[in-house]
Amino acid sequence: MKVAIVHNDRVTTQVAVRHLQVLLAEKGILQDQQHPDLVISVGGDGTLISAFHKYKQQLDKVCFAGIHTGHLGFYTDWRNYDMEKLVDALASHPVEENEVGYPLLDMKVTTSCGEKRFLALNEASIKRISKTMEAEVWLGGERFENFRGDGLCVSTPTGSTAYSKSLGGAVIHPRLKTLQLTEIASINNLVFRTVGSPIVIAPDEWITIVPKISDRVVVIVDGERISLTDVQKVDYKIAAEEIRFYQYGHHHFWERVNDAFIGDR
């Protein structure tokens, strides 16, 4: 088995990475940053999202595991003091026999220059710079509503505990193949009327957002701002690809939710 390590620059993370490298070498597990079987992120959720985007062209070949060295992470099952357990598990419980797959977001942006495709692990949002955004919202090829407000966010189930939740979105179990559309500060009047609540679509449906004014529209994918001009429409659907996580030691999803937002156990 070959392992790649992606990490942030915190001092505690650097110490953990050096220790992890020693543990892997002791078990005879090779390190290969180019063509790994397993990508281990060391840091937090942001580090794992960076690791996902770094290796998104190899999703059919790689699995992910996360070690968090700071605050609780939804994608990081292991703490830095658990690394011996993780490496022992990798040596005795093969990755290909202990993995779970979660859905990703496929976003296609159509501009006057053509089409561009993006993959998101958490969410993709669309906004207008400095002014209110006006757009038509289509669901499954049928016109649904006229939107006016700060913007719209489409999230995956794993992303439902991130930005979408802060917008009032539902928390969705990551094994469900669905996408969720949430509004960002919508304005309702006689011309622009929205449903006013999050929308969850079926696996075979898709979401289309058509801005009324195509210039000065900003698209943000997993927190990264994408510079595009003359955005004519944006289509969202569940991606054919999925992200796979090393499942051995994988924490129960609702346990994570409780620990992150309630903490009364």
UniProtKB/Swiss-Prot annotation:
Q: Which major enzyme category is it?
A: transferase
* Pfam families xref list: NAD_kinase (PF01513), NAD_kinase_C (PF20143)
According to UniProt, the reaction catalysed is: NAD(+) + ATP = ADP + NADP(+) + H(+)
Record InterPro entries? ATP-NAD_kinase_N (IPR017438), ATP-NAD_kinase_PpnK-typ_C (IPR017437), NAD/diacylglycerol_kinase_sf (IPR016064), NADK (IPR002504)
Active-site residues, record numbering mapped to chain: D45 (proton acceptor)
Q: Which cofactor does it need?
A: a divalent metal cation
Q: Drop me one GO molecular function for this one.
A: NAD+ kinase activity
One Gene Ontology term from the biological process aspect of the record: NADP biosynthetic process
Keywords, alphabetical: ATP-binding, Cytoplasm, Kinase, NAD, NADP, Nucleotide-binding, Transferase
Q: Which Gene3D superfamilies match?
A: Probable inorganic polyphosphate/atp-NAD kinase, domain 1, Probable inorganic polyphosphate/atp-NAD kinase, domain 2
* Binding site residues for NAD(+): D45, G46, N122, E123, R148, D150, T161, A162, Y163, S164, K165, S166, A185
One GO cellular component assignment for this chain's record is: cytoplasm
Where is the protein situated, by its record's location annotation? Cytoplasm
> NCBIfam families given for it?
PRK04885.1
The family note in this entry says:
Belongs to the NAD kinase family.
- PANTHER family (alphabetical): NAD KINASE
Q: What does this protein do?
A: Involved in the regulation of the intracellular balance of NAD and NADP, and is a key enzyme in the biosynthesis of NADP. Catalyzes specifically the phosphorylation on 2'-hydroxyl of the adenosine moiety of NAD to yield NADP.
Name of the protein:
NAD kinase
The organism's lineage?
A: Bacteria, Bacillati, Bacillota, Bacilli, Lactobacillales
What gene is behind this protein?
nadK
